[in-house]
Amino acid sequence: MSRVCQVTGKRPVTGNNVSHAMNHTRRRFLPNLQNHRFWVESEKRFVKLRVSTKGMRIIDKKGIDAVLADLRARGEKV
């Protein structure tokens, strides 16, 4: 399972750890992904999504039905 948010498409990015002595070592910044079950009232069932916390806020704002419609339009299976 890849570390990609199903709603926003956020994925890991790379950067550097920088010590006090300004030594740089490569690292990955991972998105804050959560496996979450959302109740879809129109379908009378739960839908499991792997979403970032930003994705959860988008679902709170737009509603789960609108977000699922966007996902299905992209061809993602939910």
UniProtKB/Swiss-Prot annotation:
The lineage of its organism: Bacteria, Pseudomonadati, Pseudomonadota, Gammaproteobacteria, Pseudomonadales. GO terms for biological process: translation. This is Large ribosomal subunit protein bL28. GO terms for cellular component: cytosolic large ribosomal subunit. Keywords: Ribonucleoprotein, Ribosomal protein. NCBIfam families: L28. Belongs to the bacterial ribosomal protein bL28 family. Pfam families: Ribosomal_L28. GO terms for molecular function: structural constituent of ribosome. The keyword Membrane does not apply.
